[in-house]
C-alpha cells in the first residue's frame, strides 16, 4: 500500500500570506490536509461518510515538516501525497509541496516536505482500528494508480 502518489493543485491566495506576501508557515499544513483529503477521495473514501457510517475519523498525531523555500502570493502549488503506511489504527503520509513554474507549468521548486501521522479515532477520541472495509479500497486505488502511471 505504499508508493502511490496523488497530486493536488492549489493557488496561494492573499489570505494565505503574511503582510510580506509570503505564505504563513502554518498554512502549509492546510494545503497538506487538502492534499490528503483529495488522495482519500480519489480512492473513493469520503471522510464525512466514514464518520457517519463507521463512526471513525482520522486525527493528525504527528507532523514533521521541513520548510525549504517560501511560497508567495499567487503561486500555483502542487501538493503530492503518498500513503506509506496503513496498519492498525495508523496512517502515515509523506507529502511534498512544489511550486509550479508559471510559464512552463512544470514543477519548479520543492517548498516543503513532511511526514504526517494520523490515528483512526472514534467520536469520543479513542483509537480504533482502520475499518477493514477501507483497506481493500486503498489497495484497489493503488492498483489503478499503478496501471495508469
Labelled PLM ranges:
Residues 2-59, 121-149:
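Hot-dog-fold acyl-thioester-processing enzymes
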Residues 57-83:
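Helix-adjacent hinge/juxtasegments
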Residues 5, 41, 71-76, 84-149:
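HotDog/MaoC-like acyl-thioester-processing domains
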Residues 10-12, 65, 81, 95, ...:
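Preference for bulky hydrophobic residues occupying beta-strand positions
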Residues 12-16, 62-69, 101:
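Short, well-ordered turn and helix-capping elements at secondary-structure junctions
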Amino acid at each position: 500500500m505504499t508508493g502511490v502518489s496523488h497530486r493536488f493543485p492549489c493557488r496561494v491566495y492573499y489570505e494565505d500570506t503574511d503582510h510580506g506576501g509570503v505564505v504563513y508557515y502554518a498554512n502549509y499544513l492546510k494545503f497538506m490536509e487538502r492534499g490528503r483529503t483529495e488522495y482519500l477521495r480519489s480512492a473513493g473514501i469520503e471522510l464525512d461518510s466514514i464518520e457517519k457510517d463507521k463512526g471513525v475519523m482520522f486525527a493528525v498525531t504527528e507532523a514533521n515538516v521541513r520548510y525549504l523555500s517560501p511560497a508567495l502570493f499567487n503561486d500555483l502549488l502542487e501538493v503530492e501525497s503518498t500513503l506509506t503506511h496503513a496498519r492498525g489504527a495508523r496512517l502515515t503520509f509523506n507529502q511534498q509541496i512544489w511550486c509550479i513554474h508559471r510559464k512552463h507549468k512544470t514543477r519548479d521548486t520543492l517548498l516543503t516536505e513532511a511526514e504526517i501521522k494520523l490515528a483512526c479515532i472514534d467520536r469520543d477520541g479513542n483509537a480504533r482500528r482502520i475499518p477493514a472495509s477501507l483497506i481493500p479500497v486503498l489497495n484497489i486505488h493503488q492498483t489503478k494508480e499503478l496501471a495508469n502511471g
